Each structure stands twice: as C-alpha cells, then as structure tokens.
C-alpha cells in the first residue's frame, strides 16, 4: 500500500490537472458560443444567394454553368477539414475514419484523388498516407479568414474548371448540437441541380421546376446580364459552402472540447475522491498501529 506522503502527492497532482481541464472547459464554452454565432450568421447569406441563383437559372434554362454539369468521374478533389489542436474527443478520429474509407473506395474504382487539408490534424493524416496534397492551410485560429480559405481552395476550383478533376468533395464535421457532431463526406461540385445546402438538413430544394418559396415573383433586370450574375453568384455560393464547412467544424471542435474537458474534470473529481478515501484509510491504519504500539509498550512496562 502506498504511503501517506505518496498519496497526498497524487491528490495534489490530480487537483492541479482538474484545475487545468476546468479552465479549458470554460474557455471552450465561451469560444463555442462565438463559433455557433458565426456558423449561424453565414446561413442567411447562403440561403439568399441560393434563391437568387435558382431564380436566374429558372429564367435562363438554356444556360449551363460548369459547376452544374455532371461528368464521368475519373479524378476527384477532396477537401479535408479538421482541427489544428487535439483534446476534442473523437472529432478528428471520426472524420479521418470516414475520409480514409472514401479514399480507399476511390482507389478501388481507379479514381485519382488530389487533396487539400485545412487544419494540422488533417495535414498530418494526408501526409502520412502519402496522398497527393496540392494545397493546405493551418493555424486558422478561432475565426476563419475567407481570404486564406480561398487561397488554398483555388487550386481545386481551377482544377475543376480546367477538367483536371471531375468532382470536388468536402470532408468535415457537421454541427448538430452541443452534444452531437457528425462527420460528413459531401459532394461540393458539381452542384446539385436544386442548389441544396449540404450543411442544412431539410433544406428547401430550388431545382428546375421546383417552387421558389417566396411571397412574390418579379422579373428583374440584371446588369451587365443574367449570365454574368449567375457566374458570380455560383462562385460566391461555392465559396460560402466552403466557409460554412470550416465554420461548422470550428463550432463542432469547441463543443467537443467542452464536453471532453467536462468529462475529464468529472473523472478527476472522482479520482480525487477515491484517493482521499485511500488516504484516510492509510492514515487511520497508521494512527491505529501507533496507538497499538504505545499500548503494547505500556503493557510491557
């Protein structure tokens, strides 16, 4: 049985660890609220762009943008969104497992893959497996910078427009609620005909022949022309989806970290209680032994 001093040292060590995890839990909770606000703030923008683009495409059915054209899949691009830091439960493990399964599937089908990584964890994974890494961006901080994101993703978008790849996928973690985050592997390009938002469940469909949910329907005059506006809107829509993927992942990261640190703090509290019980028993045994020795010595005299 360990001595009293050793047990006291262990208790002190676990108490110090609990202070750290408790502080990290509080920081993650604060960052989580801000990350959720940023995530939700981007949704109205994407919805309005989607509505306008759908209205334009319905009015100009003869126009076909490259982002909407289905091709035979011979090569694809994959954008893997992970965190820069750990201590967030199984968040990175789950999305990595899904991504590796898809990469294996592409390999079995003879489809070439070129990858882009956001976050240190994803970069490390793709480097270890020897993936064809064409761009990456790390140390994104707590607030995603759209310019930095677009700088890394431009390689993939240019490859799609030039025909080097026939589809673009994004692997990220969708934020469901504070306690639940789910890994998703979604096709970004070519866009679905209805311009559905892949990061919103139950998103309304704005496809050819579908209803645009609105209280009015006006025939707008677009400058310089409708096709130019469609080109610009679709580009912005794709950029918005990528930003949303990173924002969702950041909200998921802080939620997962808060939950993980709370679990660590609760476990530390339990360990402290168990050690305190062992300490009390050991101390009681030592006192009892000392009293017995004193009584035995007195009896001998």
Curated annotation (Swiss-Prot):
NCBIfam families: ATPsyn_F1gamma (TIGR01146), PRK05621.1-1 (NF004144)
Subunit-level organization: F-type ATPases have 2 components, CF(1) - the catalytic core - and CF(0) - the membrane proton channel. CF(1) has five subunits: alpha(3), beta(3), gamma(1), delta(1), epsilon(1). CF(0) has three main subunits: a, b and c.
Keyword match Transport: yes
Function: Produces ATP from ADP in the presence of a proton gradient across the membrane. The gamma chain is believed to be important in regulating ATPase activity and the flow of protons through the CF(0) complex.
Pfam family name, one: ATP-synt
GO function terms (MF aspect): ATP binding; proton-transporting ATP synthase activity, rotational mechanism
Localization: Cell inner membrane
Family as reported in the entry's similarity comment: Belongs to the ATPase gamma chain family.
Segments passing through the bilayer: none
Designated name of the protein: ATP synthase gamma chain
GO cellular component terms listed in the entry, alphabetical order: plasma membrane; proton-transporting ATP synthase complex
UniProt xrefs under InterPro entries: ATP_synth_F1_ATPase_gsu, ATP_synth_F1_gsu, ATP_synth_F1_gsu_CS
Keywords: ATP synthesis, Cell inner membrane, Cell membrane, CF(1), Hydrogen ion transport, Ion transport, Membrane, Transport
UniProt keyword Cell inner membrane present: yes
Membrane topology label: Peripheral membrane protein
Species, as recorded: Bordetella petrii (strain ATCC BAA-461 / DSM 12804 / CCUG 43448)
Coiled coil: none
GO terms, biological process: proton motive force-driven plasma membrane ATP synthesis
Gene3D superfamilies registered for this protein in UniProt: 3.40.1380.10, ATP synthase, gamma subunit, helix hairpin domain
Principal location listed in the UniProt entry: membrane
């Amino acid at each position: 049985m360990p001595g009293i001093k050793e047990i006291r040292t262990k208790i002190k060590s676990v108490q110090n660890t609990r202070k750290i995890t408790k502080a990290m839990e509080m920081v993650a909770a604060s960052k989580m609220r801000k990350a959720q606000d940023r995530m939700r703030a981007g949704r109205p923008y994407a919805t309005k762009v989607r509505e306008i683009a759908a209205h334009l495409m319905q009015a100009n059915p003869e126009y076909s943008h490259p982002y909407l054209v289905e091709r035979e899949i011979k090569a694809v691009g994959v954008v893997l969104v992970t965190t820069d830091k750990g201590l967030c439960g199984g968040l990175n493990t789950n999305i990595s497992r899904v991504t590796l399964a898809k990469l294996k599937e592409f390999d079995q089908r003879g489809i070439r893959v070129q990858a882009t990584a956001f976050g240190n964890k994803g970069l490390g994974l793709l480097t270890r497996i020897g993936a064809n890494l064409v761009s990456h961006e790390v140390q994104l901080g707590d607030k995603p910078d759209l310019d930095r994101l677009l700088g890394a993703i431009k390689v993939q978008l240019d490859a799609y427009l030039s025909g080097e790849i026939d589809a673009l996928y994004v692997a990220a973690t969708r934020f469901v609620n504070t306690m639940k985050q789910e890994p998703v592997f979604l096709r970004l390009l070519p866009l679905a005909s209805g311009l559905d938002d892949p990061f919103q469940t139950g998103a309304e469909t704005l496809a050819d022949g579908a209803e645009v949910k609105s209280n009015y329907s006006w025939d707008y005059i677009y400058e310089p022309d409708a096709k130019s506006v469609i080109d610009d809107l679709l580009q912005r829509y794709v950029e918005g989806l990528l930003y949303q993927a990173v924002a969702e992942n950041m909200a998921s990261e802080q939620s997962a970290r808060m939950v993980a640190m709370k679990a660590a703090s609760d476990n530390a509290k339990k360990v402290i209680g168990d050690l305190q019980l062992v300490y009390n028993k050991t101390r009681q045994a030592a006192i009892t032994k000392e009293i017995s020795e004193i009584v035995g010595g007195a009896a001998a005299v």
